[in-house]
Amino acid sequence: MLFITFRLGGERYALEAERIVEVLPLVDLQTVLRPPPGIAGTLNYHGEFVPVLDLSQMILGRPAPPRLSTRLIVARVNDDQGFRLLGIIAENVTETMRCDANDFVSPGIVSGEAPFLGTVHVGERGLVQRVDVDRLLTSRQRDFVFEPPAAA
């Protein structure tokens, strides 16, 4: 299985490559008024407005620095309405990693503050924690960025 890796602070994280639509350079976003914490704005992605989440803001409490290695990852998120696009700002998006999904093991501690942080892979280069894109958004963020289904 292929993963794209990134760093936040000194820690390494991984996203499943099959969920990634495209990796873009950091671009200017459309700002939104009074967003929940972590929501950076919206991206006009081929005519579709895609909400963007800043992982540095969510995990480290500060926005991602505007560096060459800071990228905007467009990913497919699965929810009760099917797949939707979500932009994810991540730091040090420079590598991929190939391993079996079964090589990831429980870290032994589950954070209620970060339910999107999943299992851990221990490799030659240290620990890599898997990020579950379907659990990235809190219910408040999800309600803010995705329109509810139309009433029948």
Where are these regions (language model features)?
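An acidic, low-aromatic, low-complexity terminal/linker signal
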Residues: M1-A152
